[in-house]
Amino acid sequence: MGAVIDDSMPGPGADATGTGPSDARTERETRKLEKRLCRAVGKAIDDFHMIEAGDKVMVCMSGGKDSYTLLDILLKLRARAPIAFDLVAVNLDQKQPGFPAHVLPGYLASAGVPYHIETEDTYGIVKRLIPEGKTTCSLCSRLRRGILYRVASELGCTKIALGHHRDDILQTLLLNMFFGGKMKSMPPKLVSDDGQHVVIRPLAYVAEKDTARWAAQRNFPIIACNLCGSQQNLQRQQVGQMLREWEKKLPGRVENMFNALQNIVPSHLLDARLYDFKNARATGLASADGDKAFDPQELATPAEQVVQIVPTRRSS
């Protein structure tokens, strides 16, 4: 199957407000969502020094909700930023059968965004090398990454912005723990192996539900990927569903897990490359890395697990 587009949506980037009685509430919620997205993306950019004055940022566009949201919010932030930087949207047309090649150019032109469409038949390569029924995501990702690095160099881009969000980062952490035996996730900023490119993820603090809501509000012309993202029973989809179920049962758990990625205590893990366990000896001096070994851990109790025992009177 090839890529598909939801033609039921209005034009690119159009506002989803109507004329019904709930207009005011809808507009208010939209403003709140926009403010939350801008604040989260702005904080990530600032925390990790993602964008600097004079940067030319290549925004990778897949046609999905996340990349549309990324570009839209970066455009809003650029308009009010105290520094000048350029944005160029780049899409890789992988020659999937039925891919609506007109959609992104039409949207980007109407939005006044400089763009570049790179055409490479990675679809044919993947279908030729991967047996039917096997997951194509890994090879497709490697091919796409190499092409995007090349295009970034050709366009003179200093940063490459990807649309991965908070949920992607957590899913990657759990996938690596469950199936790779390592604690590794998606970094908000990294330098490519050859030292030539800087990759940034400005949506690192953004929840997937917010990109979905923003895409619906803005009526982006979404293009679905049927080569990898829509295959059923992939490990990432299963982990994503697990996270959603956890959040439903215990609201706040996913946020706590994400916060843990920014609050690492190497002395309380088992990686001797991060902490010198071999030379850990009693010195008689207090240490910030030490621990009151026999004290109970102070952990927040999930609200749904709190049981209040109320004494009842015996009937006489």
UniProtKB/Swiss-Prot annotation:
InterPro entries found in the cross-reference section: Rossmann-like_a/b/a_fold, TilS/TtcA_N, tRNA_Cyd_32_2_STrfase
Q: Where is this motif: PP-loop motif?
A: 62-67
- Does Magnesium appear among the keywords? yes
Q: What is its EC number?
A: 2.8.1.-
Q: Which UniProt keywords apply?
A: 4Fe-4S, ATP-binding, Cytoplasm, Iron, Iron-sulfur, Magnesium, Metal-binding, Nucleotide-binding, RNA-binding, Transferase, tRNA processing, tRNA-binding
Q: Where in the cell is it found?
A: Cytoplasm
Binding-site residues, [4Fe-4S] cluster: C137, C140, C228
Query: What is the UniProt remark on how the cofactor binds and its stoichiometry?
Result: Binds 1 [4Fe-4S] cluster per subunit. The cluster is chelated by three Cys residues, the fourth Fe has a free coordination site that may bind a sulfur atom transferred from the persulfide of IscS.
- Please name the pathway: tRNA modification
According to the UniProt entry, which residue ranges have a biased composition of type Low complexity?
10-21
Q: Which cofactors are named for this entry? A: Mg(2+); [4Fe-4S] cluster
Matching entries from Pfam families are given as:
ATP_bind_3
Region Disordered: start-end pairs:
1-31
**Do you know which SUPFAM superfamilies this protein is assigned to?**
Adenine nucleotide alpha hydrolases-like (SSF52402)
Please indicate which superkingdom the organism of origin belongs to.
Bacteria
Other remarks on this protein: The thiolation reaction likely consists of two steps: a first activation step by ATP to form an adenylated intermediate of the target base of tRNA, and a second nucleophilic substitution step of the sulfur (S) atom supplied by the hydrosulfide attached to the Fe-S cluster.
Share what the entry says about its subunit structure, partners included: Homodimer.
The entry sums up its family as follows:
Belongs to the TtcA family.
Annotated protein name in UniProt? tRNA-cytidine(32) 2-sulfurtransferase
The organism's lineage is: Bacteria, Pseudomonadati, Pseudomonadota, Betaproteobacteria, Burkholderiales
